[in-house]
Structure formats: C-alpha cells, structure tokens
C-alpha cells in the first residue's frame, strides 16, 4: 500500500480497501523506521491521527473531496499550527506558529492529513540539505549521497515512500533539483500562482511553493488545491481557478493518432543546457528521454537562452539582498533564539544572530548587506535586476518557436555527502539550469528519466520541463504523457 501513488490511494479509500487512519498509521510507522534518513524534523502521531479520524468521518458521510484522507508531509518552511515551524534553523528551533500557512490550510481544507514537517536547508539556502541545524538528510537511493536541496527532506520522504506527497518551495531550483536527485516529480508553478502567506521568506521576489509526488498526475491534483489568489499575499496573482488535471491523458492536438499523442508539440532545446559542464551520464538519460518524446510525436527545436551563465551571479546578488532584509526580523526580540548572556541591547542582537544562524545563512546575509550598501546598490543590485529582465525576455523569444523547453534539471547526479561543503561556488553551480527559470518567474518541473552510470548507477536523473507563464496544465500534460510511456517514476530505492 505504501508504494501507491496519490491517485491509487484515492481509489483505495473510495473502495474501502483502507481507511485514512490506517494509511496514516502505515506512513507513521515507516517514518519511524527510517529515522536514519533524517527526512523529518517533527512528527506528532496524535495530531496526525486526529486529522485522519476526521477525514474518515467525512468519507463515511459521503462527503469529502478528491484529496480527503490522503497523507502529505510539509516542508518545514510552511508554518503549521500544532507543529514546530523552524525553517531548518536553530534561530527558530522551538517556534510554534499560531496559524497555518495558506498552502497548509488549503490542503487541510481539501481533507489531506499532515504526517509531519520535513527537513530542509536552513531558511531554504542550499542545494544539498546539509545546511540544516537538524543534520543532513540522506538520499534513499544511495545513503552516501545528498538528496538535493533545499527541499531535500520532502524529496527523500517521497522517494522512500515515507509519504505519498510533500510540499516544497523553489527559490532557485529547490523543488526541481531535489526532485531530480531523489527520482520524484516536482513542480515549481508560475511565480504568484501559489500563496506565500505563512511561508518563511528567503527571497520574496523568487520564492514559490509547489508539490512533490510520484507523478505528474499527483502533482496536478495537489496543485488544484494549493493554487489560487490570496489577498494576504501581495505577490499573489488574481486569476480564475483552473483544473490542472484537465489535459492529462489527452492528445496534444485534437485528431492525433493514438500512437503519436504529442504530434504538434514543439520542444525547445537550449544550446546552453547541453554544453560544457553537463555530465555524460546525465546527458545520456536526457537524450533517451527526448527520443521517447519524439516517438510520441513531438518535434525537437533548437533554441537559445544566451544569458544562462549570467543567471548564477544575478541570482546571488538578488536573492541574498532580499534575504538580508527578510532575515533582519530574527533579532532575538520578536522572533527566535536569544543569547543567554549579553551586555547591552546591541550585544544581544549580535550574539543571538551569531548563535542562531548557520554559516551559509550568515554568508548570504553578508553578501546581501554588501550589495545593498551605499555605493554598491546601483553597481550590483540594480544591474542584476536589469539582466534579470533580459533573461525573462530571452525565454519569451525562445517560446516563439516552441511550446515547452526541456533539458537537464541539474548538470550532475547527486554528489556524495560532504563533497562540496567547503566550496560554496561549486554548490551554487549545481543550480545553473534552474536559476534562470526562477529569475524569469516561469513554471518548471522535474520528472525522473533515468540514472547515472558507473559508481553513480543508483543515483537518479531528472528531466526539466519549462513552460510559459500560467501554462502549468499543458506542462503537466507533457510530463504525464512521458510517464504513461515510461516507468522511471515508478522506480523505488532498494528495500522500499
């Protein structure tokens, strides 16, 4: 039962093959048995089972919706009433929110049962989930490897079938890269599609929540519940609600032959995504996936995203600048850890932040404060914003000749734990294919498409699919067609 997808579990609940309480108990038992992965930072069985009992009561009355009784885990960046909400930081080690994030509230309103809070890089700053105050997360496929970050706890939980689905957030690739490393499906929606209210902020012009699950169809179900306008989030976009499942299983164009359902689909391949730095084993898996798309009737079209390399310096100016502002609220007075011994008020600020923040967070706060300082604001921050606009324009130019863009989610498979901890630049380079999508505010997703080679043969590869603004339903259709033709998304780690 634990290996079933959300769609399959929904059918099992409807057929009364199991109850919501039995499902919750099953996953809680698995979470407890897999503590060594360190995927979860807070579990409360009593709270979970109370929600499951309420879901069973709804189902018994013939009420409830598509997600009622289905379990989900939440990344610990979403504040969740009753559970600790720490953002992976000592600064918030024992913080409990008096309210739920909109994402959490909407999924609970849809009847989903919260299994617990997943581990993450501190304040979502990292690509390996080694920056957490609660310890590193291990990749279920190879426990010597990282699971990706910053949503590494969520990706590991779904991969190990400790939860059928989880929420994540993506600022520069933090859903897509860990989904790639852990062999699960994850989608970052268009910026503003999912409410940021109650999501502990890193970089406000980039942060976006999204689902992680076994398949594109599961992600579509979750996105139906998660998305929508929220007046409490000033970046939330007013658009009519839509059904993200509506194109699943449908041909790209009416009248397409059953054997060529994607005839007419134009897939853009950026030259910049297939050059130096892309590992051979990742390239081989991506090429095989593209051939599968051709077999389904799609056409491959060369495109160019000439500012791809600039996305790294642009991101690491803008994101730290916004982080330095957002994290100024954690001062030991209003929120978070307070030093036990200090002299005056200023000394308390300094010691509380020095003790509460980890090295990577401190590094980014310092960088952000520097680029916003007098004399550097114009030279760095404003210049980065100008290039960001050009990056977005490059995508629009590419979409004139294609419907979706594809390439690797990451230049390599997951690396060993500790391999890049002393070299932040190498860590930053791991997000080269995802950063530009975030800077442009576009939707993107990663779907499993193979494995590495040699010593990396157990480490998954993810195919990145990028859509134009608000084109998630079509993007999910394209991913779903691939998953109907292949079984990479059904593969599980040994012992699972």
Swiss-Prot record:
Pfam families reported for this sequence: Amidase
Keyword Ubl conjugation found: no
GO terms of biological process kind: translation
UniProt keywords, alphabetically: ATP-binding, Ligase, Nucleotide-binding, Protein biosynthesis
GO MF annotations in UniProt: ATP binding; glutaminyl-tRNA synthase (glutamine-hydrolyzing) activity
Record function comment: Allows the formation of correctly charged Gln-tRNA(Gln) through the transamidation of misacylated Glu-tRNA(Gln) in organisms which lack glutaminyl-tRNA synthetase. The reaction takes place in the presence of glutamine and ATP through an activated gamma-phospho-Glu-tRNA(Gln).
PANTHER family linked: GLUTAMYL-TRNA(GLN) AMIDOTRANSFERASE SUBUNIT A, TRANSAMIDASE
Protein name as annotated: Glutamyl-tRNA(Gln) amidotransferase subunit A
Organism: Burkholderia ambifaria (strain MC40-6)
């Amino acid at each position: 039962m634990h290996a079933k997808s959300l769609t399959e579990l929904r059918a099992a609940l409807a057929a009364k093959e199991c109850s919501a309480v039995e499902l919750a108990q099953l996953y809680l038992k698995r979470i407890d048995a897999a503590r060594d992965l360190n995927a979860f930072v807070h579990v409360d069985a009593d709270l979970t089972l109370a929600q499951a009992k309420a879901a069973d009561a709804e189902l018994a009355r013939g009420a409830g919706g598509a997600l009622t009784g289905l379990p989900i885990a939440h990344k610990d960046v979403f504040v969740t009433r009753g559970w600790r909400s720490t953002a992976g930081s000592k600064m918030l080690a024992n913080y409990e929110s008096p309210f739920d994030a909109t994402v959490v509230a909407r999924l609970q309103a849809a009847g989903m049962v919260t299994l617990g809070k997943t581990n993450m890089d501190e304040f979502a700053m990292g690509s390996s989930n080694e920056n957490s105050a609660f310890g590193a997360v291990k990749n279920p496929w190879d426990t010597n490897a990282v699971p990706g970050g910053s949503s590494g706890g969520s990706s590991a939980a779904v991969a190990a079938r400790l939860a059928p689905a989880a929420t994540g957030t993506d600022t520069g690739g933090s859903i897509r890269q860990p989904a790639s490393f852990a062999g699960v499906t994850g989608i970052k929606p268009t910026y503003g599609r999912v409410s940021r209210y109650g999501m502990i902020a890193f970089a406000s012009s980039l942060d976006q929540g999204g689902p992680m699950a076994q398949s594109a169809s599961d992600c579509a179900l979750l996105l139906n519940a998660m998305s929508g306008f929220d007046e409490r989030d000033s970046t939330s976009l007013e658009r009519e609600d839509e059904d993200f499942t509506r194109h699943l299983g449908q041909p790209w164009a009416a009248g397409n032959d059953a054997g060529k359902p994607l005839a007419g689909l134009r897939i853009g391949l950026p030259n910049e995504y297939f050059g130096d730095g892309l590992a051979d084993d990742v390239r081989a898996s991506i090429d095989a996936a593209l051939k599968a798309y051709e077999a389904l009737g799609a056409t491959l079209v060369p495109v160019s995203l000439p500012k791809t390399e600039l996305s790294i310096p642009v991101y690491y100016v803008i994101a730290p600048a916004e982080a330095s502002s957002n994290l100024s609220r954690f001062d030991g007075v209003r929120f978070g850890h307070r030093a036990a011994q200090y002299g005056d008020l200023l000394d308390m600020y300094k010691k509380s932040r020095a003790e509460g923040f980890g090295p990577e967070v401190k590094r980014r706060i310092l960088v952000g404060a520097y680029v916003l300082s007098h004399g550097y604001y114009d030279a760095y921050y404003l210049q980065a914003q100008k290039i960001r606009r050009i990056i977005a324009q490059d995508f629009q130019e590419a979409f004139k000749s294609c419907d979706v863009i594809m390439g690797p989610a990451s230049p390599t498979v997951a690396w060993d734990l500790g391999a890049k901890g002393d070299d932040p630049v190498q860590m930053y380079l791991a997000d080269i294919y995802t950063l530009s999508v975030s800077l442009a505010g576009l939707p993107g997703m990663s779907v499993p498409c193979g494995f590495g080679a040699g010593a990396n043969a157990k480490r998954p590869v993810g195919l990145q699919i990028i859509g134009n603004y608000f084109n998630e339903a079509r993007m999910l259709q394209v991913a779903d067609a691939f998953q109907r033709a292949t079984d990479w998304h059904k593969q599980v780690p040994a012992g699972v």
